UniProtKB/Swiss-Prot annotation:
Pfam families recorded: Ribosomal_L12, Ribosomal_L12_N
InterPro entries attached to this UniProt entry: Ribosomal_bL12 (IPR000206), Ribosomal_bL12_C (IPR013823), Ribosomal_bL12_C/ClpS-like (IPR014719), Ribosomal_bL12_oligo (IPR008932), Ribosomal_bL12_oligo_N_sf (IPR036235)
CDD domains per the UniProt record, alphabetical: Ribosomal_L7_L12
Family: Belongs to the bacterial ribosomal protein bL12 family.
A molecular-function term among this protein's GO annotations: structural constituent of ribosome
Record GO biological process: translation
Residues with the N-acetylmethionine modification: 1
Keywords assigned by UniProt, alphabetized: Acetylation, Ribonucleoprotein, Ribosomal protein
Protein name: Large ribosomal subunit protein bL12
């Protein structure tokens, strides 16, 4: 099969068939058909982000365990920690390093909470 025959075969395909073809090519060759990201100001700003906010999205089923971890992380009293958990989504820590944010997220997810790092 030469290049022209391949192009003719592709022209005859439906949109669904083309979609399947693209997925098969991506899997076969380990590539992606996504448009490349243009390196610009936004990309540079994203790379430079050094401070992150840890937000408790929801407490999940193990609310008491989550309250204990929130107290440990924030240093809040029992009543204040319970209010934070009850009023989720709520920021727990702001302006922390990526490593610290990931550590906090792991502790909270370990006890069943949903956490976002922004």
């Amino acid at each position: 099969m030469n290049k022209e025959q391949i192009l003719e075969a592709i022209k005859a395909m439906t949109v669904l068939e083309l979609n399947d073809l693209v997925k098969a090519i991506e899997e076969e060759f380990g590539v992606t058909a996504a448009a490349p990201v243009v390196a610009g100001g936004a990309a540079a700003a994203a790379e430079e982000k050094t401070e992150f906010d840890v937000v408790l999205a929801s407490a999940g089923a193990e609310k008491i365990k989550v309250i204990k971890v929130v107290r440990e992380i924030t240093g809040l009293g029992l009543k204040e920690a319970k209010e934070v958990v009850d009023n989720a989504p709520k920021a727990l820590k702001e302006g922390v390093s990526k490593d610290e944010a990931e550590e906090i997220k792991a502790k909270l997810e370990e006890v069943g909470a949903s956490v976002e790092v922004k």
